[in-house]
């Protein structure tokens, strides 16, 4: 029975160590990404907009179009953008 506990303990330790290593790698990558945003900002690019562009590029085209349509509807309802002209108005 002691041998089974030893094996489980070793497996648990291995999982924990792998997770810790991956967490450290994740932190390193996050720091690298932060540095790239800083570099882009120093060259005159807006980091907030860069993040938005990356977010948009991750989306499926249909999903993005649907979200843009909903956003336009909300903005029109609030009077923040003019309502789209209908074909009848032309």
Curated annotation (Swiss-Prot):
InterPro entries in the cross-refs: GapR-like, GapR-like_DNA-bd
Protein name in the entry: UPF0335 protein Smed_2680
GO molecular function: DNA binding
Organism encoding this protein: Sinorhizobium medicae (strain WSM419)
Recorded superkingdom: Bacteria
Family label: Belongs to the UPF0335 family.
Lineage of origin: Bacteria, Pseudomonadati, Pseudomonadota, Alphaproteobacteria, Hyphomicrobiales
Database matches in HAMAP family: UPF0335
A Pfam family assignment: GapR_DNA-bd
